[in-house]
Every structure is written in structure tokens, then in C-alpha cells.
Amino acid sequence: MSGVDQMKIPGNTAKSVEERNIPWSQQVDEASYENLSSPTHDEVSGNDNSMQFQYPPFNFKENCNTPWNNMNKGRKANANHDSYRRHGHSIPNNTRRDEHQVNPWNSRKPAAQSFRNENDQPSTKLDNRTSDEAQNQEVVAAPKKTTWASIASQPAKLTSRAASTTSNSKKKGPGMPPPPMVPGKHNLDVNVWDLPNNKPPPVPSPPSPIDLGYSDLSSDFSISSNTAPPLGARAEKVHKDTENFLKYEHKGLGNNNNFSRAKVSPTGPVRRNLGPQQPVHHAAPRPATNAGPFGPPNARRHDGGPHPSRNSERSGNYSSFRGSEFESASKFEYRDENQSRPVEATSATEELPVDSQLVLDELKDKNNYNPKVLDLKKAGSARFFVIKSYSEDDIHRSIKYEIWCSTDHGNKRLDDAFKERHEEGGNIMLFFSVNGSGHFCGMAQMMTPVDYNSTSSVWSQDKWRGKFKVKWIYVKDVPNGTLRHIRLENNENKSVTNSRDTQEVPNDKGIEVLQILHSYNHSTSIFDDFFHYEKKQEEEVSSKRPPMHGPDGNNHAPAPLARSFNRQADDKDRDRDGRGGMSQKHFNSGGGAGFRNPGHRGGAGSGGSHNNYSEYRRGFDIHKSSSDYQFKDRDGPDFDRENDFGSHYGSNNRKNEYKHNNTNKARLKTRDRDFSTEQIKIGVRFKDTDKDKMRSNEYS
């Protein structure tokens, strides 16, 4: 029934007028709410006639002087207070909250906002209108007036998701103040997590883990199927490490992903080049013995057999985790995280003994050095020569590359002897010895004539021209004492140990030397230092390389080479000194080989200008040299370090220096010089004293 019908009920007219004049919010007592029952689902379709109790009569005209807005405020406050006492706090089941909720006060519609809970409590409809709007609306719609009791008595309506979405998605208009806070009612929407308009920014779901065992490993390394099961054990560890970085990988943090992969690929792009070489190493046998393991010297260093083996050795360090291999693998990983390219160069230096051992083993297998049986029949028709080498480095490379080269004069002598013996079916035998070593290091057979048009770059010095092949037979150290008794009649009856390069040994004397070499029980040989000379050769080769563009784009110049002996340049210097002339260029060049005259030579290796000026200040004392200071008797009582220092580098006492210079100037008058004093004045700067300045002022 409507509110107007309620006022016409006779039972309600017994109340006095004073009670009717009392505001409604003060007349209603708490007992009147006892009859209000919570609506159930069966009462959803109920209408206004389903109310459980009657309200006191209400006359709009009598109470027109009471503000409607105040009455609504009081009624709503009591309703909320009574609802709180009866039903307690309204707590929803689902306590999840969306951090990106829309403000529930956005809606301007007077429709009810529902709270879905277990008890299905009736939703409260709030009136957000201002007092003026409410009065105007009530005056216009007085016959169809709706009281707060009719609204409160209506059963709770189950709002659908679509309705809630519509009400919640309403945007607050510009300039609208927020509604007042109602006590006992929270301002959060519940059970709207899955609503499309209230969704937070989408959270990316973690993708499925990547199978590194089949995708990344095969693409990065190109490992063939016939290799050992190397990276199977490591795939699990890398798989776990990669899972920690999957969410960052999709956010653009690629460095973390690369870091996790760096543990698998120790050498980065270099490993891709190593993959195809491994099957070749396992499948290809060693080169044939008759063909030799090296071929040409330059080709051997690039296409030789040991390089694939060294690559497979390096790959084995990464695929195995047993014993010392684990330590080497961790060492390479640490180096790769800081820098990737220097790993290969460093490993090549560290694995050099392994490479040298392979070279040495192949040489011994091929040549059968130091044979047990000596065939003297071939020695009867052979010619013997003594070869003197400047260093054992050249002996090492001669054994390694099976070549030799002598001076121009020595090459011609050996070439003529080889051609002569080749027609007769004989051989050329060479006894090798290093200058100053005190022993012979072996014997080799000359195999080919001298090739004057070919030059090898493997020697420690670049002055040698031409080459010929040799075959080493004996490699052992035989002291000179065992051979010193052999005299050579064709060399002023000197001992064979006192021979010059390419000195021919008569046949009978040569056979005697050969027998001693064969029967001597040696304890040392150049093979003992083979690894040392291999490393030294690598250093020399790297220093001789032309400038290359490094990764920074700059030219990296090679290390300066040691000064080599040049016979033609030495002859020119000797001829120039013999003519007695001295140019200004040599005067300023200072000490060294260019300053041939011992009277004017500066200290060995010292600068030219400063040294010559000191020589001039000392009056060119020809009796002094830079080596005199080394042989003085430092233990004698007459030795004075300070005075001795002053005699060489100039005294600190000007008086002594003045006397010393005057004495030496007297010697210059009687000394023959190969240059004039005017030339000296051109290249020497004098220091003017106060006396000189006074004299110049007097004559000017």
C-alpha cells in the first residue's frame, strides 16, 4: 500500500496532534523495527503490499514546515544504526581488492548499489540530491510521494553483473562533489575483479621455458652428432639459470639473458668456427710418413696437423668436468666474462707445449733419429762439411722444417759439392755446431741443391738468401773434447772443432767424426729445449707481423726488430772511415756502430749530441773511454767514487774543470784530426760566461 493509504487507517488517528507535530525521526522508536524481517529470495518479486508493519500516520501538509532533507538525514542515520545493531557489519565473502578500482561515488544514479554476501542483506539506496532539488521534486510529485519506509521495506534486488558494470563504469561528471560518507558502509566494490572496465593493466604471464638443449646449443656451437656427450650435463644448469631471467627477457633486459648464456659459450663466436673442424680431426688420419708432416714452411704453420688437435683439446675442456679439466674450464669461463677474444690467444700460449710435443713426436716417428746401425759404405763416397750456426734457434728450425741456408759464399760451395757428388752417387754430410756452444749438436744430410730464388722467413735473422732441404740423422750433443784430437790438414792442421762455416773435412777425417757421433752415449740434445725454442719462435713471428687494424680501429705496430748484421753496410762504413772524412751526420749520430773512430766514439748505446758535447768539454781525451770505469780498482785506497764520477761525467768543481780543460786544449794542438774546428763550432753550442760577455761588450 502507498504512504497516502497508510494515513487513512482509523487505528492510526488515535495519536495526538502533539505527536504528529514531533519530527518523524524522533517519533520512531527502535521497537517498530522489530517486525522488519530480512527479505529472502522468494520475496524478490514482492511489491509495496508485502510490508510487514504499519507506519504512523503522516500528513505532508502539517509537516511542510519541517525540512525534508533533515528528515531524510535522520531516517537514514537511524536506519543505518538499526541495521548495524541487527545484522552487524556487512562483510563480503571474497576479500580480494582491486588496486585499480573506480571510485564507487562516481555514480549519480539513485539506483541501489548492492553488496553480495552470504546473508543477502538489503541494499541501501542513497539520495545524493541537494535539499533544494529534493523539495522541488517532492512538491511536483506530491501525489506519488515515496517515503523512506517504502524504500527500506522493499526486498533486496539481485543486480546482475551487467548492471553493476554499468553503474560502476559511470564517470563522475565534471564539477560534481563527492557524496557524503555514510557510517557503516565501506566504499570498495567487491567481486568485480573480472569485470572488463575495472581490470588493472594486464600482467604478462610467464612463457613456457625454452629448451636450451636443442635450440640454443645447436645454433650457437654447431656441435656435430659424433662428438662426445659434452653439454648434456650442463644443459640442466643453464636451464635453471635461464628460468630466472625469462620475465626480464620479455621486458627488454637482454643483458641478463646473455649473461646466462655466456656460461655455456666460453669463447662466444669463436666456438662456431671450432665446430666444423672437430669431425675432420676425428675422421682424418695423420699425414703419410713419406709425404712429411709439414710441407712448405709457411704452409705448415697454417695447415699443419696440430691445429685441429689443439682446437679439440680446447673443446674437451668445456665438455668435461673431471679432475684438472674442470679447473681449466672454469678458467676459460672467467676469462670470457671479462673479454672473449683474448681467450684464444692466451690459450694458444698456454697450450704451446702440447702443440710442440705433437710436432716433436711426429719428427721422431718420421726420421728415426740416432740410428743404432751405422752404414759406412755410403760414407766412403760422401763429402763432409762443418756448419757453424749463430744460434740454436736456427738449429731448432732446421730440424723442424728440414731446411738450411748458409751465406752466399757457403751456399755456392755446398751447391757445387752436391752437384759433383750427385753425379757420382755420393752424399753430402753436414756436421752442425753452434758458435761458442762447446759441442756439436748433430749431423744432417744435404738432400737438394741450393734454391737461390727461394727465401725462408723462419730464421732468427732475415739476412739469409736461398735454401736447401736437409735430413737430420743424428741429434745429440757431443762435446768438443771428444773431437779435438782430429786435425784438418786442409785447414792449417787445425782441430776440427776450430773450423769456420762450410769448412770441408777430408773423407777419412769425416768418417772418424761420424763414428764418434754414432757411438757417443749422449745425455742432452736440443730436443730438451725444443719447447723453449717453439715459444721463442712464436714470439718472433708475432713481432714480425705487419700492422693490423685492431678492434678499436687503430693500427697496432709490431714490436721493433733486433738490429741485424748487414755485411754490405759494414763494408761501406769501413770504406768511408778509410777515406778519413767525417760528415756532420756522423758527428751528430753519437755512439754506436756509426761512430767508428775510437778517439771520438761516445759511450756504447748513448745519445750522440750530449755525449759529443761532453767529449768536447773534456777536450776529446782520447785516453778515456766508457769502459775505463768498469776496470778501475775500487778496492784500492786511491779510488774515490766522487772524483771518478767527475772524471767521466764532468766535475762539480768549476776550478778543477777549468784546469782540466786547459790541459786538454794543449793536447789538441799537437793531435791530428780528421775534421776541422769550424765543424765542431757548427754542431756545438757554447755557454757564455760573464768574462766572455764583458769581452764582447768591449770590442763591440
From Swiss-Prot:
Keywords, A to Z? Cytoplasm, RNA-binding
An MF annotation (GO) of this entry: pre-mRNA binding
Signal peptide segment: none
Q: Which stretches does UniProt call biased (Gly residues)?
A: 589-608
Q: Which Pfam families match?
A: YTH
**Which GO CC annotations does the UniProt entry carry?**
cytoplasm
Q: What is its main location?
A: cytoplasm
Compartments where found: Cytoplasm
- Biased-composition ranges for Polar residues? 23-39, 62-72, 114-125, 147-168
Region annotation (Disordered) maps to: 1-191, 250-352, 537-612, 624-665
* Phenotype on disruption: Results in fusion of the adult Beta lobes in the mushroom bodies.
Q: What spans are recorded as compositionally biased (Basic and acidic residues)?
A: 300-313, 324-339, 568-579, 624-645
Family matches, as CDD domains: YTH
BP term (GO), one? negative regulation of axon extension
Q: Which InterPro entries match?
A: YTH_domain, YTH_prot
Residues that bind RNA = K388, S389, Y390, D394, W404, C405, N435, W459, W464
The UniProt subunit note reads as follows: Interacts with Fmr1; the interaction is RNA independent.
UniProt similarity note: Belongs to the YTHDF family.
The free-text function statement in the UniProt record for this protein reads:
Specifically recognizes and binds N6-methyladenosine (m6A)-containing RNAs. M6A is a modification present at internal sites of mRNAs and some non-coding RNAs and plays a role in the efficiency of mRNA processing and stability. Together with Fmr1, regulates axonal growth in the mushroom bodies and neuromuscular junctions by repressing the translation of several mRNAs, such as those of chic and futsch.
Q: What is this protein called?
A: YTH domain-containing family protein
- Species of origin reads Drosophila melanogaster (Fruit fly)
